[in-house]
């Protein structure tokens, strides 16, 4: 494990004992509305770009415990076409036990071998890049994702655009930086999403109403075309 990946592992170890993280993880209304919102956008993107979900081959970078993998299966993806990478060993064990039918890559995603079998229609990341504070490593990972992508495929991106003043282990990534990371892309389409978490956690059932105002959204979904 290199220095940068070790930093990420250490960050997540600290989060396990962070009272704010523990408290927010159980916020039903915010988690429900935020997840439903982004899954709707993913669905619209995928149905617009691909004719048959059953033929799409996808790789998720930093899949965690597999919440998104369940979503892609519900959308019509076949298990044999769903692939996942995870750096953290405890989360990887959950993936291995929960998804014995999919192909898994443990450790640093930059170490995934590039070959004909390891090329994908979609390479997906969700809140991975904001945990990487080193610019060089972000560029390296973006280049690896690009190299794993088939021509005509997309990098599907979900992450927050603004810094979290209460968490120095993360750094927001705006449109300009995404464009620089994937400067080989012929076209990037952005969608603003996710009501600002400090607001969303407080307003509960009013999330959909306040989320009508784009200036209150803090995250970006990006379709990054190859």
Q: Model segments located where?
A:
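Class I SAM-dependent methyltransferase SAM/SAH-binding core
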Residues: 59, 65-112
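N-terminal, positively charged/glycine-rich alpha-helical extensions of SAM-dependent methyltransferases
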Residues: 1-25
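Conserved beta-strand signature within the Rossmann-like core of class I S-adenosyl-L-methionine
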Residues: 152-159
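Short alpha-helix
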Residues: 170-193
